[in-house]
């Protein structure tokens, strides 16, 4: 069996095209395909539409309704934990990945050429602000976390059941998922593709969500910011000692305090700002530790439905 995990949030108007795309994938394979739809607290009619018998589905499906919006990565993690296939694909509901990419990702694993296959964007059609944020974030993540991660990030991937089982055992924060794909090892392959322009709606991946994801993923996978803080502390200490020695000699030789009240105040301001930044970084790590030790689930399932193919209605 092949499983396709699709997180759903405000995707009501994308569902007809999504089902058509998934039906095309089913047509490509002779073995059974299941689709795991994880409705991430979506406020629209997505859950009802996916149950509708008016839309012809050539595949079995699981409909997992979460109790609220936990975030796309939490929904993906829930889908991975519940998928039953020997190969599991994770894709978005916006249909911006070509069907041939899905089949290529699966074929790499089915034909035993890889354990993890990752779709890598060759181009980005996003707005300027999104492209800039993405470029900065992934550059930082590659620098601090893992430089094997693609420059444009990861949106779609497939993995074998063996890899999925290892990710379940790790049970890390959902924000660490992309990093885990490159941390767990195994045979990995990347497949380039040109992303299709979004036809309907707009991304719900807001700046606030991106910022939270950036902080969570970096604190889950890198201790480099703490090293930077240590370096900053050493540099600040050296500067402070140098200034103290300068003031002391100035008073011993000229018997007066050195001029320059403004530079001193500015220096204090810079040091205080550095300290506040350091406290913020430490706080982010402490919060990540606190979140992980609480043992709360990454999501809560409110309802689950098992649906068979309704091909007979066509």
Language-model segments: residues:
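Acceptor/aglycone-binding surface of glycosyltransferases and processive sugar-polymer synthases
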Residues: 66-68, 72-82, 99-175, 197-215
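Residues in soluble alpha-helical coiled-coils and helical-bundle/repeat scaffolds
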Residues: 9-13, 96, 100, 168, ...
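Hydrophobic helical membrane-anchoring modules
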Residues: 176-314
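Solvent-exposed polar/charged
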Residues: 55, 81, 107, 134, ...
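Structured catalytic core of nucleotide-sugar glycosyltransferases
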Residues: 1-126
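Residue-level signature of catalytic and energy-coupling elements of molecular machines
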Residues: 22, 79, 94, 117, ...
């Amino acid at each position: 069996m092949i499983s396709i995990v699709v997180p759903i949030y405000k995707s009501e108007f994308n569902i007809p095209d999504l089902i058509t795309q998934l039906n095309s994938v089913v047509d490509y394979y002779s073995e059974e395909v299941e689709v795991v739809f994880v409705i991430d607290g979506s406020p629209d009619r997505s859950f009802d539409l996916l149950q509708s018998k008016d839309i012809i589905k050539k595949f079995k499906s699981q409909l997992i309704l979460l109790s609220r919006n936990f975030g796309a990565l939490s929904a993906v993690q829930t889908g991975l934990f519940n998928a039953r296939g020997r190969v599991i694909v994770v894709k978005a509901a916006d249909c911006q990945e070509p069907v041939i990419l899905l089949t290529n990702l699966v074929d790499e694993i089915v034909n035993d050429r890889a354990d993890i296959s990752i779709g890598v964007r060759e181009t980005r059609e996003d707005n300027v602000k999104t492209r800039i944020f993405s470029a900065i974030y992934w550059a930082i993540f590659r620098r601090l976390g893992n430089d094997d991660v693609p420059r444009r990030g990861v949106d779609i991937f497939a993995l074998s059941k063996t890899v999925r089982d290892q990710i379940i055992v790790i049970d890390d924060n959902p924000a660490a998922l992309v990093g885990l794909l490159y941390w767990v090892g195994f045979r990995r392959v990347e497949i380039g593709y040109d992303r299709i322009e979004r036809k309907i709606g707009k991304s719900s991946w807001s700046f606030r969500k991106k910022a939270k994801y950036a902080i969570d993923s970096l604190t889950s996978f890198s201790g480099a910011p703490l090293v930077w803080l240590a370096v900053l502390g050493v540099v600040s200490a050296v500067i402070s000692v140098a200034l103290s020695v300068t003031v002391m000699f100035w008073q011993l030789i000229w018997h007066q305090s050195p001029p320059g009240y403004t530079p001193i105040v500015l220096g204090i301001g810079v040091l205080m700002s550095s300290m506040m930044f350091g406290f913020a970084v430490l706080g982010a790590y402490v919060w990540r530790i606190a979140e992980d030790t609480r043992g709360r689930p990454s999501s809560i399932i409110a309802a689950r439905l098992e649906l068979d193919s309704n091909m007979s209605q066509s």
